[in-house]
Structures are given as structure tokens and as C-alpha cells.
Amino acid sequence: MHEEVQCGIDEAGRGPVIGPMVISIVCCKEEYLREIGVKDSKMLSRKRREYLFDKITKNCAYSYVVVSPETLNKDMASESLNKIEENYILELLSKAEGIVYIDCFDVIEERAEKYIREKSGKEVVCKHKADSIYPAVSAASIVSKVIRDREIDKIAEKYGFFGSGYPSDPRTIDFLRKAMQQGLDLRSVARIHWETYKKIKEDVESGQKKLF
């Protein structure tokens, strides 16, 4: 009996102020992915993600791209985050055949789906929460999250603990403020176009001016 191969694309690290965004594609037998128990990476412990990552990368076709903060800083001077993500998705789609399911990054699913279909010539389905619906998208979310976690570990080794890297994390905010007060150049690890970054930088600079 023919086993259906499913392809999915998902990202990790779209919203943080620190660290890269990772976008992955996984093509694999749907039955196998269900057997090993893939699900949205946010619902899994790091240990479980690492275990599933090993299974996925040994038994499925996959590819990923790490979009560094430096690249995001450069590209976001002229393009939106949605457009940047679209461009990398188009790059990954060139490796796929058949229908590809994508965890939708746009608030309007139809708009993203139409654009990607027209630009790639591929049949795609863009859906919000696709990582909870399609096993291949769940697998892609796991690959993206594991790769990003490893990149975050490298940053933490160099700069010390900074929390999750998300703007909602007080530990991340505290790290950014102290690093800026010390005059550290964070452009290789932080996203300078994020409002969080701009606000902290403004506060630190205005505080320093008051000292003189």
C-alpha cells in the first residue's frame, strides 16, 4: 500500500528580540510522523523535542534556514518580517513536491496562500495553527525549535543567561538594559528594529545624558 508523504513548513523565533528565526521544511510519511508522536513543538519538553528531532532527521527529508539577527536587522530596514519570511519559504519550497502545508504567518490566510502559490508555482495550504493540524508541519516546528534552541545556547555561552529572548520576559529586558549600559554591541544577537530594543536603547541613552 502506498504511504502518503506529507510536506510541511514552520518557523521558530519569529517574535523574540534576541536570537535567530529558523524556518524548516520536512517531507515524511504521515503515518511515521503519527507513530513517533509529533505535535506542536511548544507543547513538548526540550528533551522530547531533541528525541523527535533525531527521529525526524534520520528518517525524513528536511531542510532549514537560520536567519540571523544581523540578516534580520539588514533586511528589516526595507522589508517587513512577513516579506522576509515569505522569501525564505519560497526558497525552501523549491525542494518540495506535491502539496505543502504551511503554518501561516499572515493574519489573512488566503493572502499568504495566493502570493506563495503564484510565486512558487507550487500547491500550498496556509493555515493558522497548522502545526497542530498537519504532522509534517508539527515535525517542521520541532526541527526549527531545536535548531533555534542550539543557536540560543551559543549566544548564552558568549553573553550569559538572558532568559527566553522574548520581549515579554523581564529577564530578557534586564539583560538588554544592562548590556546597553555597559556599551556592548548587540547587533549580532538582537533585533534592533524591534520596538522593545528601541525603547530600552532610548531609555538607556536618555539616562546616560542625565548624568552629564
UniProtKB/Swiss-Prot annotation:
Pfam entry (one): RNase_HII
GO cellular component, as recorded: cytoplasm; ribonuclease H2 complex
Enzyme class at the top of the EC tree: hydrolase
Keywords: Cytoplasm, Endonuclease, Hydrolase, Manganese, Metal-binding, Nuclease
Database matches in Gene3D superfamilies: Ribonuclease H-like superfamily/Ribonuclease H (3.30.420.10)
Keyword field contains Nuclease: yes
Sequence ranges assigned to domain RNase H type-2 in this UniProt record: 4-206
Primary residence: cytoplasm
EC number annotated for this UniProt entry: 3.1.26.4
Chain sites annotated for binding a divalent metal cation: 10-11, 103
GO BP: DNA replication, removal of RNA primer; mismatch repair
Role noted for this protein: Endonuclease that specifically degrades the RNA of RNA-DNA hybrids.
NCBIfam families per UniProt: ribonuclease HII
Identification of the protein by name: Ribonuclease HII
